Design a protein with these regions (language model features):
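Alpha-helical interface subdomain recognition
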Residues: 1-80, 186-188, 195, 237-464
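FAD-binding core of flavoproteins
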Residues: 87, 94-245, 252, 311, ...
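Hydrophobic alpha-helical segments that drive targeting, anchoring, or assembly
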Residues: 63, 67-74, 78-98, 111-113
Length: 464
């Protein structure tokens, strides 16, 4: 089980990320990114803090943290809508390092679906983070490809404010890294043993234009429909954490607005109908938080290592609030809602600096790891599927209730709520919506002979 040292480590890392993102990833910066303005300074601050290489082994210059330790950073990135793919980059660099591939500089986007090869080019119509990333780590017909943005022809996808877009590359500019699978951490080494050339011309994936496109339905003619590949699991995990963090912030904004907006002589948060809706919203937010914790459990973990509830449960009324009002913040869950009150913060810690040592760590070991076992950067397949499915399921309901409480002001360009709800709806579909992942979960459950309860237990324990 997780111990106090792990909790403190998570708090230190999450607090450092919270401070950095609060200072560098403002709503103004996100609006600038949506308009195509550069955000290089914000990215450099994040990379200098060490977050991008948090999952890379220490022997390769990273922090060597286990997958679960990355969740507080991803939640903070979601709360502040970081306009660069830090969650994707952390997971992509960890995966590349684990498979012996060079890690390119700059932010990396994960694109498990939507890219295809035809007429000597690789192309996609809705490539994630294409307007702000420097590379795309893509899955095409069971192969991993590293695509540099400098060589890409990028076009708008026509969606207002989207950081995704259309892109294409000459095949000669792309680097094939070899075959990938969902549960084999060693398979990346196969691609380094010379079976494939630089552009992956092995006779199955050549240049004759007869290439299927890997879509969110998982069908590409070569892979089982109920076996998500590694990049799909990584992307699902990243989006689960981002959505959970963004929903925390949306709930905080809604609570604050409900307690300050007066109607008929009292705050609207004191009306029972509004309280009931926000209660439903809070349930969805906390379900998403727990789902994200489940998704960030790596394949190498302690049996029975269930995700823990992050510091603070749904609180009672805060001091000074009138009876019947809605609590203004959830301590420990949304540090951004309470500036300066971050439980577990290190006194005197430098803003934005990732803690260089974790209290529970021993030399050469990573916090929370099993003795003698290197934690995997890969999430458990069913844990990632459940995490993404549940957060995607919660996203539209949270967004709808937030806009219902805010009314017309919530959709105005000047108000920040629409920045969050637009991304929640985008991220709900990214890397597969809840219906896509529900199909995988159901197919996996039907393959076994467990009861429903036993299946849930095995998923929660990473044994499914």
């Amino acid at each position: 089980m997780n111990n106090a040292g792990d909790t403190l480590s998570d708090n230190l890392l999450g607090d450092a990320a919270e401070r950095l993102f609060a200072q560098t990833c403002t709503p103004a910066l996100l609006r600038a990114a949506e308009q195509g303005q550069p955000i290089d300074a914000a990215w450099r601050a994040c990379e200098d803090a060490g977050f991008a290489d948090a999952l890379v082994p220490e022997s390769l210059g990273g922090a060597g943290l286990p997958l679960a330790a990355a969740l507080p950073v991803v939640l903070a990135a979601g709360r502040h809508l970081c306009p660069y793919p830090i969650a994707h980059t952390m997971l992509a660099r960890g995966w590349l390092a684990a498979h012996g591939h060079a890690r390119p500089a700059g932010p990396i986007a994960l694109a498990p679906h939507g890219l295809s090869v035809a007429d000597h080019r690789i192309a996609g119509t809705n490539v994630p983070w294409i307007r702000v990333a420097s590379h795309v780590l893509a899955q095409i017909n069971g192969q991993a490809w590293l695509l540099p943005l400098q060589a890409a022809d990028v076009q708008s996808n026509g969606v207002h404010g989207s950081l995704d877009g259309e892109a294409s590359w000459a095949l000669a500019d792309a680097q094939c890294l070899g075959p990938i699978r969902a549960s084999d951490e060693q398979n990346g080494r196969e691609g380094r043993e010379g079976r494939l050339g630089r552009n992956g011309h092995d006779g199955r994936d050549g240049q004759d234009g007869r290439h299927g496109q890997d879509g969110p339905d998982g069908h590409n003619g070569q892979r089982a429909a109920d076996t998500p590949d590694a990049l799909a699991l990584l992307a699902a995990t990243a989006y689960a954490g981002l959505m959970a963090g963004a929903m925390e912030r949306v709930l905080a904004m809604t609570l604050d607005y409900a307690n300050t907006r007066a109607q008929f002589g009292k705050s609207i948060g004191r009306f029972q109908a509004v309280q009931q809706q926000i209660s439903v919203m809070a349930e969805e937010v906390w379900a998403a938080n727990m789902a994200a914790q489940l998704a960030f459990q790596s394949q190498v973990t302690q049996p029975g290592n269930l995700p823990r509830v992050m510091a603070g449960a749904l609180p009672n009324a805060m001091p000074g609030e009138t009876p019947g009002s809605i609590p203004s913040a959830m301590p420990g869950a949304m540090p951004g809602a309470m500036p300066g009150a971050m439980p577990g913060a290190m006194p005197g810690a430098m803003p934005g600096a990732m803690p260089s040592a974790m209290p529970s760590a021993t030399p050469g070991a990573t916090p929370g790891a099993m003795p003698g076992v290197m934690p995997s950067v890969m999430p458990g397949a069913m844990q990632a599927a459940v995490g993404k499915a549940r957060t995607s399921q919660a996203a539209p309901r949270v967004a709808d209730i937030a806009h219902a409480v805010h009314g017309a002001i919530g959709v105005t360009a000047e108000f920040d709520l629409q920045l969050y709800t637009r991304r929640l709806r985008d991220w709900r579909l990214a890397a597969g919506s809840e219906s896509f992942w529900h199909a995988h979960i159901g197919a996996h459950a039907l393959q076994g002979e467990d009861s429903a309860l036993d299946f849930i237990r095995r998923v929660a324990q990473g044994q499914a």
